[in-house]
UniProtKB/Swiss-Prot annotation:
Pathway(s) it belongs to: Purine metabolism; AMP biosynthesis via salvage pathway; AMP from ADP: step 1/1
Family from the record: Belongs to the adenylate kinase family.
Identification of the protein by name: Adenylate kinase
Annotated segments matching region LID: 127-165
Biological role stated in the UniProt entry: Catalyzes the reversible transfer of the terminal phosphate group between ATP and AMP. Plays an important role in cellular energy homeostasis and in adenine nucleotide metabolism.
Subunit-structure text: Monomer.
Primary gene name: adk
GO process terms (BP): AMP salvage
Amino acid sequence: MNLLIMGLPGAGKGTQAEFIVKNYGVNHISTGDMFRAAMKNETEMGKLAKSFIDKGELVPDEVTNGIVKERLAQDDIKASGFLLDGYPRTIDQAHALDTMLEELGIKLDAVVNIVVNPNILVDRLSGRYICRNCGATYHKIFNPTKVEGTCDVCGSHDLYQRADDVPETVKNRLDVNIKESAPIIEHYTELGLVKNIEGEQEISQVTDDIKKVLG
């Protein structure tokens, strides 16, 4: 089975990716792992990627695509299939993936897309507060303080949010993700591959729904 998994930050993609890999015995391929392995093994594309990273530059698409193709060409992929996580990030990468899969004779079976309302994700991702005095961490929904505004550990009233946890920052980050992922999802929908999964349910129910669509 050859799969992609998609979903906005905070949608629970990582948890469900772990389940799919364990349940279906496919290889979990994440962009970070691929880059690290390619650089460690000093593959042609790995050396190229390292040359950009060492200069503090963004790795161009053609190098990223090359690293993905190197990984998909390996024997364990032919034997067990894959779950691709974190790629493609742009519509150009999606078209490149189509081409490389065709060249390698690999068929993509499904795109698992975990759907959660962005407003809910803002709440999930922006609810973290930290005690400036002792460093204890809280979440306004999942782990609130017993007394509002007071640290359970040290009793301090000095609770703060990190800049990247502020709702406006989180919303901006999600907006960028939505803008980039929308054409990719549309592309795979046209190919009849997208399986939309309701991600606002309990984790176990999300997992059950994935089992239903993948068989």
